């Protein structure tokens, strides 16, 4: 990579994983990264990780913007800062996030959501001023959300960067940028699981394992994990799962299996972490009549599906969740502290490691039955 010598930040040429067309694999090539504008920071990435949402981005979801650089989990060191940035400096280690928290808008003041109006979850592929900081020659390259961590250098709005405690390992901090935190937060911030309650988690990837750990931390008395891969049993148990069900090969639906396991009562909370639309109905019907809550936190290639009316009419609740309701400034430090105190077995998440040039090998690893998280080392 090269950087022109100048007292002020200048354009950097570096390597990044670029997706040019929906469905095509990322290609590692040279890009140009502009200096940060007044309220932005430029980050030298140290570590990133793969999330299944990145696979969706490679396939044109949620918006088909190409060429684009995916990636929304990672950790890096601030290389330069804009003139108006006062809370961050060169050399700080930070997590680039896809949500911000101004603390002043209606949503932030409510304390009931993490979806900030001033620093929102963005789908335009551009930064807040409506432009990109990345290009290949004259070709503009789109960001993924507000970050694009599959690049050696990135530029983000400073409000989307959270400092990393040096006691947290880089891979662990990367995992907290999305998947695991999404599951954990959904049991704590978005839906506060009551102590002694019963929980099911559909899908035991990083999001599902986060939900299992969160339910355990909240004091759930029974945590049933469901996955079609028997190898996920051991992972689930490491995070606090009390029972495991593999529905593959059964002639019964997931809701039938859960209701059978609960004497027909169902469960207090059911977390749908697979992103398969048909399983939302299974999650709803697995929850208790009149009392149960189904929480939707998975995302997949299918973006719509039918929801049955009668099960909802019977007093059940459905809740959607982004990043588990976790607010970057107010809540994330609590989760980081849990990692520091070894309250969460984060080492269980990391199963594979690749370099940026091996990004497509990382996608192949995601298909392995024993894979949970793939780390990218820069």
Curated annotation (Swiss-Prot):
Q: In which tissues is it expressed?
A: Expressed in the leaf internal phloem-associated parenchyma (IPAP) inside the mesophyll.
> Mind telling me which CDD domains this protein's record contains?
liver_alcohol_DH_like
Localization, per the record, is:
Nucleus; Cytoplasm, Cytosol
Q: What is one GO biological process annotated to this record?
A: formaldehyde catabolic process
Give the reactions, separated by semicolons, that this protein catalyses.
(6E)-8-hydroxygeranial + NAD(+) = (6E)-8-oxogeranial + NADH + H(+); (6E)-8-hydroxygeraniol + NAD(+) = (6E)-8-hydroxygeranial + NADH + H(+); (6E)-8-oxogeraniol + NAD(+) = (6E)-8-oxogeranial + NADH + H(+); (6E)-8-hydroxygeraniol + NAD(+) = (6E)-8-oxogeraniol + NADH + H(+)
Q: Does the keyword Oxidoreductase apply?
A: yes
Similarity field: Belongs to the zinc-containing alcohol dehydrogenase family. Class-IV subfamily.
Q: What is this protein called?
A: 8-hydroxygeraniol oxidoreductase
């Amino acid at each position: 990579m090269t950087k022109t010598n100048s007292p002020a930040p200048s354009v950097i040429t570096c390597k990044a994983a670029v997706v040019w067309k929906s469905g095509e694999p990322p290609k590692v090539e040279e890009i140009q990264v502009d200096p940060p504008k007044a309220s932005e920071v430029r980050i030298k990435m140290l570590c990133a990780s793969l999330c299944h949402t990145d696979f969706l981005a490679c396939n044109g979801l949620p918006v088909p913007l190409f060429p684009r650089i995916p990636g929304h989990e990672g950790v890096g060191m601030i290389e330069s800062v804009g003139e108006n940035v006062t809370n961050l400096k060169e050399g700080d280690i930070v997590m680039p996030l896809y949500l911000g928290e101004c603390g002043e808008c209606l949503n932030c003041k409510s304390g009931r959501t993490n979806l900030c109006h001033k620093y929102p979850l963005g789908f335009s592929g551009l930064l807040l001023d409506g432009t990109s900081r990345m290009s290949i020659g004259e070709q503009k390259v789109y960001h993924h959300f507000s970050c694009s961590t599959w690049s050696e250098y990135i530029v983000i709005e400073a409000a989307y960067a959270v400092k990393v405690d040096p006691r947290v390992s880089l891979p662990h901090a990367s995992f907290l940028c999305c998947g695991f935190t999404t599951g954990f937060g959904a049991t704590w911030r978005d839906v506060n699981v009551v102590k002694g309650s019963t929980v099911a988690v559909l899908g035991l990837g990083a999001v599902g394992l986060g939900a299992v750990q969160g339910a355990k931390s909240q004091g759930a008395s029974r945590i049933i994990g469901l996955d079609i891969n028997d190898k996920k049993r051991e992972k689930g148990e490491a995070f606090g799962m009390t029972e495991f069900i593999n529905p593959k090969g059964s002639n019964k639906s997931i809701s039938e299996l859960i209701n059978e396991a609960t004497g027909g009562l169902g469960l207090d909370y059911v977390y749908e972490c697979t992103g398969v639309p048909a399983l939302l109905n299974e999650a709803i019907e697995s929850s208790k009549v009149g009392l149960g809550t189904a929480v939707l936190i998975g995302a997949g290639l299918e973006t719509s599906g039918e929801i049955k009316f009668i099960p909802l009419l019977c007093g059940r609740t459905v809740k959607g969740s982004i990043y588990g309701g976790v607010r970057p400034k107010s809540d994330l430090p609590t989760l980081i502290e849990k990692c520091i105190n070894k309250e969460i077995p984060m080492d269980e998440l990391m199963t594979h490691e690749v370099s940026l040039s091996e990004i497509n090998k990382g996608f192949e690893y995601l298909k392995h039955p024993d894979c949970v998280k793939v780390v990218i080392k820069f």
